[in-house]
Amino acid sequence: DNGPSVQALLEQAAEKLTTQPTPVQGSGRTDAGVHATGQAAHLDVPIHLTATDVMRGLNALLETHQVSVVSAQPVAATFNARFDAVQRSYLYRILARPAPSALRRNAVWHHRAKLDATAMHEAAQTLIGRFDFSSFRAAGCQADSPIRTMDYLSVLQAGDEIHITARARSFLYHQIRNITGSLVQVGMGCLLYTSPSPRDFTE
């Protein structure tokens, strides 16, 4: 049991603040174990509540949880955080060393074996562009089309960590998680890439 979702916590707080059921729509899903920074969401509140009232009120109700609202502003009634998002970004932090980190335990993926970040980055560049990413979506993906455009994908060595950053307007369910797994296989020397096609990349 991973406990209530961030959306559920926000909706519970919003209902207390507005004294009525208040749905909260985020710009995208946040899977269990994922830390969301800069997540955008929208909700409808009574007109007498200012953006500052909403931010302060929600934070007061969320202070016992690991969720905080860092800013709020009024938007058009037609605004939708999910469908109006112009770009989404993922950052995977991999701690590539034998020993785990006590302080970063819940913020990084600990990988005991050394990884070749240069090879991983070169492989990542073949996935930039518009492709059929069927090979990288999870079985439960409900997207109508597997076609997505990867705007940016990089792999950088950052001290004892390897950072994988991906940016696109939208992603398939578990697309970046599965791409990260494949790039790690490249970094270990277990997987070679010879084609810019995502389908060939995993075969």
Where are each of the predicted segments found?
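Single conserved hydrophobic/aromatic residue that forms the stacking wall/gate
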Residues: 193-203
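Structured-RNA-binding interfaces characteristic of tRNA pseudouridine synthases
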Residues: 1-195
